[in-house]
């Protein structure tokens, strides 16, 4: 069994935006989708997860609407807004750039400095 990876600070909102960009989901469905996309590797606490959902909705990056879940229960389904799409694009570019910079630093040997 592979060890779970602790989610780096500041990435949860980006991952929620990505999950919702793949199609509308209720809160728990978003959490499950992130787990699936990570190969069940990320450890996400439900308290911080739902706080992030509400924060994204307040910022206008996702919007919620009441509907019926797959088990016939009332649930709030979230979808990405145009502002959320722009934010996801910006966050993805920033994360990709940062990952490349860190990878470049970590790959350096003493004689390459």
Predicted segments, located by residue:
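Amphipathic alpha-helical dimerization/coiled-coil segments
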Residues: 86-113
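Basic, amphipathic "hinge/linker" alpha-helix immediately C-terminal to the N-terminal HTH DNA-binding motif
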Residues: 71-92
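A cross-family signal for key residues in well-ordered alpha-helices
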Residues: 18, 32, 51, 89, ...
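N-terminal helix-turn-helix DNA-binding core of bacterial DNA-binding proteins
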Residues: 5-48
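Glycine-centered, phosphate/nucleic-acid-interacting loop/turn motifs that mediate DNA/RNA or nucleotide
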Residues: 60
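Short beta-strand "wing" residues that participate in macromolecule-binding interfaces
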Residues: 64
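Basic amphipathic alpha-helical segments that dock to polyanions
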Residues: 49-56
């Amino acid at each position: 069994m592979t060890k779970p990876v602790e989610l780096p600070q500041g990435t949860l909102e980006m991952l929620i935006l990505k999950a919702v960009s793949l199609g509308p989901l209720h809160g728990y469905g978003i959490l499950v989708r992130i787990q699936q996309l990570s190969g069940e590797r990320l450890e996400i606490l439900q308290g911080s997860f739902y706080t992030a959902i509400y924060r994204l909705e307040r910022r206008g990056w996702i919007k919620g609407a009441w509907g019926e879940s797959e088990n016939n229960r009332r649930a709030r389904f979230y979808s990405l807004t145009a502002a959320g799409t722009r934010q996801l694009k910006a966050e993805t570019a920033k994360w990709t750039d940062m990952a490349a910079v860190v990878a470049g630093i970590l790959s350096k040997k003493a004689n390459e400095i």
